[in-house]
């Protein structure tokens, strides 16, 4: 389902489409409360209709929102409106790592800088018990001002089963159970999976 300019999802007014993929359609939108531009991802209708999938989406949104890190796309909000489930993130300008790779070789130093930034972001996620599960060039974004952002934790897995002991409680820790994947199912992009995911 595509949204027309001017469509409202709560306080967010759709401006124009900026991308689409298996995890939903992405739009440039205006936050009418805070008067800022944002990106709104509208999830596929099957997610919006499925109560369990919607709860999983909300859990993931909360998990990623706890990851305040310069190399992870910031989530501002999530919700549902008129049968559409959506998330709201910071709006980025630039290109994906896939597009940059397709444009030709880059200097080794630049490639190393990008790799280090990705590793920093993943380390922050892993410290909170979150595994991305679909890391690939299409999910890495290079902004026009030189930042590296990891996108689309939409199939992330929460691996921390129990909250930390009270003495070690981190106010941003995730007191949530692990996400469940159906037995025998494979999640991610085959060419970028770790071997143990394919077993």
Where are these regions (language model features)?
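Conserved ATP-binding/catalytic core of the eukaryotic-like protein kinase fold
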Residues: 1-199
